From Swiss-Prot:
The keyword Cytoplasm applies. This is UPF0291 protein Teth39_0326. Its main location: cytoplasm. GO terms for cellular component: cytoplasm. It is found in: Cytoplasm. It comes from Thermoanaerobacter pseudethanolicus (strain ATCC 33223 / 39E) (Clostridium thermohydrosulfuricum). Belongs to the UPF0291 family. InterPro entries: DUF896. It holds the Pfam family DUF896. Keywords: Cytoplasm.
Length: 75
């Protein structure tokens, strides 16, 4: 889970890397934190998309008359 501390730490490491540079340990930590962060964001996006997809599906069955689609078929 993304916490405030995690974001603060990512920012801290980023700024330190821009100013004085990071130790090997800090570089590893930064890489881990970023991977965790990206993974979490992707999960959130996936959940969002799924909930949107389900919302759209339920709309199709909300009682509208779909017979008007049939005039496109040639007999």
């Amino acid at each position: 889970m993304i916490t405030r501390e995690m974001i603060d730490r990512i920012n801290f490491l980023y700024h330190k890397s821009q100013t004085e540079g990071l130790t090997e340990e800090e570089k590893e930590e930064q890489k881990r934190l970023r991977q965790e962060y990206v993974k979490e964001i992707k999960e959130r996006v996936r959940r969002e998309l799924e909930s949107i997809k389900y919302a759209n599906n339920s709309c199709e069955h909300c009682g509208h008359d779909h017979h008007h689609h049939h005039h496109h078929h040639r007999h």
